[in-house]
Amino acid sequence: MNPRAKPGTNGDNPPPARMVLSLLRFASLLFFLLLLQVRPAGADWNPLVERLAADGFDRRTVEALFTRQEARFEPDAMAGKIRSLIQSLTPVPDSLAAKLKDAVQEKYLTSWMVARARSYLRENMSLLEEIQARYGVPKEIVVSILLIETHLGENTGNRIAFNRLASMALYPDLEAIRPYLGASLITPDNLEYARRRCREKADWAYSELKALLRLAARDSLDPMSIRGSIYGAIGLSQFMPSNIFAYGVDADEDGRIDLFAKPDALHSIANYLHKHGWKREVDIRNQERIIFAYNHSTVYANTVLAIAEKLRGRR
């Protein structure tokens, strides 16, 4: 017999039921306390609710949204944005800058990817020629953008756009997301820049959040059902919500602009480029400038143009 066993028990037997129950209760309490510790401090949505209500949104509707199970504070949205902005401050050597000027994303120029884009172009030729005639934007450019943005509509993002935008809008104060940035990222040299950009991006996200809510109300959609990219871009064409109002096209004339519907998405891409200056005869420099407006990256613009050239059979 185990000399340490309590009277009336065998040391090899399980403890009494009462002890097991006590241990389970203690474990549950410990888990709950740990959960409180790791829960993001920004889970209080009240400041955002107040701001939206002051801007005319129905308070009860907004409060109901933020109390739903799907509503989550996702600090990585703003943290990722600030991290990329700070990293962009690193000086680029002249030799590398010269290479980047003409750089492309090679993964979109493989024979397999170009073949997919060419097949998509053939399958949707009638629609794309209609778009080209209406906006003056070459069909190859439209398909190239679609290939890069969502792999021809196959990957439109699986994040809840509401959460991404609300999380960024909630905290214009850098200190609130600083714990998620890493200890060495913020330095005395970039601190003020990071603070300013955090405020600016929070304001931008708030404007986009309002546009998302207006879009959902207009089209009778559940805001939580709208999925998008890590920063809240939506649909095959990856438009921010405000751009849907500015450049979206109801091409299939069903009474709503649905960027998950092919006709609306492709027309909207071309309309965006057209509204930014694309004409039937536009030189290469202006082509680069206009595509850059769609996605602020020189490499992106270069890649769109390179894919389009391959689709035309010139490269």
Predicted regions and their residues:
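Cell-wall glycan-active module
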Residues: 1-5, 10-12, 16, 21-25, ...
